[in-house]
């Protein structure tokens, strides 16, 4: 939340240079405050689990949020009861004439398909186009980030020889960008994907800025102009047991899956997971909400 100080206080310039949110008394006295409208486009089959993960993070701020859950009308969800979707979700057609302060587009287990092979690709493209003029800032996660980078900037994805699976160390590349306010220079984030986007392709698009990457896991955080689009290739929203559940699920299916790296204590799946990403996950979501949604959105959408 902002701190209110005199506009002539010498510390103001220093704080602003450090991306500390300061507000003059004049602005504070005239500021209107309302709940922020946040849409979550949930593409995951485990919808209720994903809901809890994201709501836990975006709810960890002093901001009041009015959350709208969305699902794809052009896709039949087989892993969630229709009653749940009917009761708690809307479709794009339901909200396309509204505006939102923020939009989160989740990952989806469709990355081995080309984008055009995904059955809801045309609908997703319409939503991503809509977000450019009707949403203050959109946060794309994992496959959602790959889809956004491809649709908006033509950045391709590439198959990996082995699944990127585990918790990896990342390095901050742009320390003074507000999204990374409070981040350590090195931080951890989970990844769980069969494809990647490449650093050279990101750096080849002048509108994009690479914020954080990993020697082993590659690109993690990317931002577009003015923070209108944020892309997170990892899963900072994951709960403690999510990678464990994915590992056990794939083993039960008889798939050749390695133990997630840097995740279990002593890398032993019989021991408990070590959570090393929670604090930076909270920072990522709170910084996005604070700096790119709350501070930038108009009072009247």
UniProtKB/Swiss-Prot annotation:
Site (Important for acyl-CoA specificity): 111
Secretion signal span: none
Superkingdom, taxonomy of origin: Bacteria
Localization per record: Cytoplasm
UniProt binding sites for substrate: 163, 192, 249
Gene3D superfamilies per record: 3.40.50.880
UniProt xrefs under NCBIfam families: metA
UniProt cross-references to PANTHER family, sorted A to Z: HOMOSERINE O-SUCCINYLTRANSFERASE
Catalytic residues of the enzyme: 142, 235, 237
Catalytic activity: L-homoserine + acetyl-CoA = O-acetyl-L-homoserine + CoA
Bilayer-crossing regions: none
EC code(s) of this entry: 2.3.1.31
Entry's family note: Belongs to the MetA family.
One Pfam family this sequence matches: HTS
Name under which the protein is recorded: Homoserine O-acetyltransferase
Gene Ontology biological process terms from the UniProt entry: L-methionine biosynthetic process from homoserine via O-succinyl-L-homoserine and cystathionine
GO molecular-function term, one example from the UniProt record: homoserine O-acetyltransferase activity
Role of this protein: Transfers an acetyl group from acetyl-CoA to L-homoserine, forming acetyl-L-homoserine.
Any one GO CC term of the record: cytoplasm
Keywords: Acyltransferase, Amino-acid biosynthesis, Cytoplasm, Methionine biosynthesis, Transferase
Positions marked as site (Important for substrate specificity): 192
Pathway where this protein functions: Amino-acid biosynthesis; L-methionine biosynthesis via de novo pathway; O-acetyl-L-homoserine from L-homoserine: step 1/1
Chief localization: cytoplasm
